[in-house]
Amino acid sequence: MYSLFRPLLFTCDTERAHDISLCTLDIAYHSGALPLLTRHPRPLPTTAFGLNFPNPVGLAAGLDKNGTHIDALFALGFGFIEIGTTTPRPQPGNPKPRLFRLTQQQAVINRMGFNNLGVDALVRNVAGARQRNGPLGINIGKNKDTPNEQASNDYRYCLERVYALADYVTINLSSPNTAGLRALQEEQTLRRLIGELREAQETLAAKHGRHVPMLIKMAPDLSDSDIDAAARVLNEMSVDGVIATNTTVTRPLLRQHRLASETGGLSGAPLLGQSTLVLRRLRTHLPETIALIGVGGICCGADAVAKMAAGANLVQCYTGLIFKGPQLVGECVEAIRRRREASSSGRASTQ
């Protein structure tokens, strides 16, 4: 069904197509027509950072920034949903146009700039959601006009606001579209910031009587030494998990494309190799107690398996959905299932 809808959708401006897709999804969900769009995957139970997931394939942050489509998105068969990025105060994001589709390359360049209605609006929307068929993650960031020296105040405020409703919280330090944000990944700055947020997490856990996992979302553009330094901090601070990775400011395989010079983060197929290398290096330097979510460039089941082979416990997709449609969810679940079954058969044959 999506293959019939996509050509019409791709005649629209990219950001308008995004809005139309979400509106259509909601209509299909509320009318009961959603089964015509996709087939729900069979369960593939997975456990990570103390949470149980019906399957290991989730939706990355960015599609539903304000938590207004939670019910419909879960109905597509995702094992978990991550909403946001949300900030303490509403902000409009960067001027339009700010979203560019590279159809042949199955890629997108965005410079959205954390456009959202603010954390209070998101909290109201989450409280009103009725269908949560898996864990709900909430991705939090700082406002554009908040200096890095005060960034911890923004993250702590959002953490306090969403803690009671989130199954896990992601600290977004890696969007390239908020000036200076990625500087928060520098070793000493990262250590101070995570230290403050871990203290807040422990205080909130005592207040609410439950531990909500805190994950850190990393950039793909770090050098090996920067990745290793970040891994040291993440291990020292005993974070619950890491998401690898966000979008890239480099342009792998796109140097001749007419949109390659557009400012912003690149996602989609060209990001797969780069993001998977970061994932693999993090897995090498982090203990198994710190779970990893692999995201970046997943456009088919084989891509999801590549993330798992590199050390991911879970995977997320977003840009691939634009080109493949919601059937990508089931394709990834089934590919990971086959990998698990093959691995189990291999172990059994050696015993």
Swiss-Prot record:
Pfam family, one: DHO_dh
GO BP terms, alphabetized: 'de novo' pyrimidine nucleobase biosynthetic process; 'de novo' UMP biosynthetic process
SUPFAM superfamilies membership: FMN-linked oxidoreductases
One MF annotation (Gene Ontology) recorded for this entry: dihydroorotate dehydrogenase (quinone) activity
Cellular localization per UniProt: Cell membrane
Keyword Membrane annotated: yes
Active site: 175 (nucleophile)
Description of how the protein assembles with itself and partners: Monomer.
UniProt-recorded name of the protein: Dihydroorotate dehydrogenase (quinone)
